[in-house]
Amino acid sequence: MTHISNNRPRIAVIGGGIAGLTVAASLLRAGIECTVYEQATVFADAGAGIQIAPNSARILHRLGLAGALERRATRAHAIETRRWQDGAPLARTELGEPCVERYGAPYYLIQRADLHRSLLELLPPGVVRHSAACTAVEERPDGVTLRFADGTSEEAGVVVGADGIHSALRNHLVGDRPRFSGHTVHRGLVAADRLPSLFEVPKVLFWLGPNGHVTSYPIAQHGLVHFSAVITSPEWDPEVWSAPSRPGEAAAAFAGWNAEVAELIGAAEQAHHWALFDRDCVGGWSTGRMTLAGDAAHPMVPYLSQGANQAIEDAWVLADLLGAADLDPGPALRRYEELRLPRVREVHRRSRERGHEFHLPDGPQQRLRDRSMPTAERLDDYAWIYGFEAAPVGSR
C-alpha cells in the first residue's frame, strides 16, 4: 500500500472522467492525498470504444491495470486503412507482438466504461465524491477554496481541472471558447455477430473518402463493434454538442461508400451524432496552485486517437512532479505545463492535419496521399507517439 504523506497539500481533482481518475490514481501512487469531485450522481455504465496506445498503456500497467486490461480489453493486431469506394487496401500497420516488442505494451481496444471502471477500482472508497458540481474557485497564496452548486465549499492546496472540453476551470484560467472543427461524427455500437467476416482478427479499420472517413474496431468482451463515421459539416448550432442520430441519417451521409461501410452503419440499432470541437493549443493553464489535465487543457480532434492517451500522460507527469515537489506546488505545476505543452501541441497539430488528409476529395492530392501511405503508416513511423516516455523525474 502506498504511504500517503501528510506533509503535502491535499489535491482536489475536478471531474471524474478518464483524465480525473488517472490523475487521482497517479497521485495516490505518489503518496499524495486527493479527492475527485464529480458533478454526476452516478457514473454511466455505457459508452463507445476507446483506443489505448502503447504510450499510455505502459502508464496504466505501472498503475497496476495490466491484469484488468487483459481481461476487459482486446489487443489489436493491426491498423488497416482502405479506400472509401471499393475498400481497396491503402496501408497496414502491424501491431500485435511487434508492437509489444517495439514499444513495451500492446495496443488495446476497450469500451470507455470498462477503462473507467478499472481506474475507479484503483481508488479507495471516499476518494470520489458525486453530485459535486464545482461552480467557482478562489485561489490564495496558501490554498484554494472550491464552491459547489449545492452551496457547500471545500479547501485544497492544489486544484486540477480535469473536467473536459466544457471545463469551468479552463474558462477561469484561460477564458477561451471551444472551436467547432467543421466535422461531426456518428458513433454507434453493433453486435459483432452481425459482422462475422469484418473482424475475424481484432484490428482497427479506417475507410477514407471525400469529406469523411469511418473508423471501426471490435470490443470483444461485450461482443460489440464500435464505429465512428466522421463527415465534414460546415454548419452546426454551436449551442448543441450532441443529439441522437435520426433514422437513416448516418447511412445517407455515407451513401455510395463500399458494401462493408454500408453493412457496418446499417447494422447499428442506434447511433449518436456529435459535433467535434477543439481549442487552439495554448499555454497559460497553470498558476501557483491550479492546473488542467486532459481535454480541459488541450482538447483535440480524434484523428490520431490520442485524446485519452494524452490525458493519461498528463496524469503521470503531473503526479511525478508533485511527488518530488516541496510544500510549494507552484514550481512543479509550472514545470508540468512546460513539459506537456510541446508534446500536446505536436499531437494536436498533427491530429488537425490528419483530419484534412483523411477527407481529401478524389483527385491528385488524394492519389499522392494514397501512394505515400504504405511507407508512412509503418509501426516505426509512430515512434514519436507510441515510444514517448512520460516520466520527467523518474522517481517511480
From Swiss-Prot:
The active site is at Y217. FAD binds at A19, E38, Q39, R112, D295. Residues 352-371 are annotated as: Disordered. The gene is PtmB3. It comes from Streptomyces platensis. This is 3-amino-4-hydroxybenzoate 2-monooxygenase PtmB3. It catalyses: 3-amino-4-hydroxybenzoate + NADPH + O2 + H(+) = 3-amino-2,4-dihydroxybenzoate + NADP(+) + H2O. Binds 1 FAD molecule per subunit. Transmembrane segments: none annotated. GO terms for biological process: antibiotic biosynthetic process. It holds the Pfam family FAD_binding_3. It is an enzyme of class 1 (oxidoreductase).
